[in-house]
Amino acid sequence: MSKQNITYNQIDFVVKAPRFRIVFSYMSDKGVAFVREYLLRLLKITPCKPAQIAQYFGFNQYETEVALADLEQHKWIFWQDDGLIVLSTEGQRLFQDSQDSPHIPTLKECGGEYRMELLDSNFLKKNDCDKNRQQAIELVVEPKVLSESSEIVRKTFQNRFRQLMEDDIIKLDEKDISLYKIDAIEPKGVPDYFRFTQQFELLPETGEAKERHDVPTVTHQENIQQAITAQLERFGHHDNLRELRNSMAEISDDDTLKVLFGGTLDFNEYLKVYQKHEQQNGLYFLGQIYHQETLFQQINKILDELSKKSSKKLYWLAPSDIYWGKQRKIHGNIQNLIDKQKNGYDFRLYLPLPSERNRHEKQEWLNHFKDISDKVLYGFCEGFLDGNTEILFLEDQFAVVCYHAKLSSYPVTLPIGFMTTNIRQVNHIISLAKNYLSSPLFPNKNEDEIGQKDFGLLKP
């Protein structure tokens, strides 16, 4: 493992990005036709009568009338009382910067669908947007901004038109153009969401948190960054190192406390533990379980080698942490475990609930994982290992443990953990999880009211 800036968490944020149908007219700078150009150049030098123009160009009367009608239609000329034809103010404007050749604006119309996020009014490319806000933290947009979004879009489109051309948001073959006017703005259905992943890093030399990176896909982001900071402060957290010490003792993990002992990650100690697990054919990691590619490669290898006649339990017990599951990558890993169930195991994702009857929390989880089959979504009573420890296990094969450390040194949770295939250790970890799920919810109640901490399917 190289000693560079270390990513310890990755979180998706979303901002409402309404869709609008925008129709606009634009002007293209274009040299005028030969006759037009020389006739305009002549009139710039001196006013003329029709007969003089006919003589100068060798036109007959009809050709002269057609040429003059064209200029008159565009309001580039007018007749004086003495019969002389002169350039109008509009005609004089065609000669930009005292150039000899005139340039005229050709008006064209264009329409398209555009998306604009509502915090810094950045227009967005389609692939930076998402129809869903699941697996992310939504940043707050003021109601006033939502109600005035059409007018904000109009002003921003006008003011940043050239920049939108350069950023390839507005796609036109012609490049040297300018906006003439916006003809129509029409909101289009349910808004999209601007989705971006914010990486949270620490410095390996000191363990200190690094400042957040800018969002790479947008130019304007002052309000976005302020909204992220406000949201993180709103979530807040108390230091849970004391509770983690108890969880580590339950797991029989003597190593991780040394890594976090001072309230920050000791990278040198982390490397020692990493190498120790590597020597034991295990894996030690920093970050969310669902971000560990090597971990899931090992898991997939184990699953692919299972006997299809076996009927093992593959359980994933989520922690009680606001940042858990707030990144789209979790969806792919869960779906992968669902798809491989034909290999001979029963997969369940256990999600923490304050009580069995809490319909609001159940519905929130169902919405959060709305693209996942509800046949694998289970509820359990929050509080397993103080809610700070996540477990993923397959009976008789492996166990993954991830502690979710809330430390004052870091703005968000620092997940850290390990995978083991040591059967003795695996069985110990699995017994902790199974004993908790089967333990009575109300041990002092009558037998009919005792209940279990395993609440069963979220949607029976």
Task: Enumerate the predicted regions with their spans.
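PLD/PLD-like phosphodiesterase catalytic module centered on the HKD motif
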Residues: 20-24, 79, 140-312, 324-460
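Basic, amphipathic N-terminal segments
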Residues: 1-6
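Short amphipathic alpha-helical interaction segments
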Residues: 57-73
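Short alpha-helical segments that sit at the start of domains
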Residues: 8-39, 51, 63
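Minor-groove-contacting beta-hairpin "wing" of winged helix-turn-helix DNA-binding domains
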Residues: 83-89
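Short acidic, hydrophobic short linear motifs in intrinsically disordered regions
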Residues: 45-56
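Short, amphipathic alpha-helical interaction segments positioned at domain boundaries
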Residues: 89-141
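A short, conserved structural fragment
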Residues: 72-82
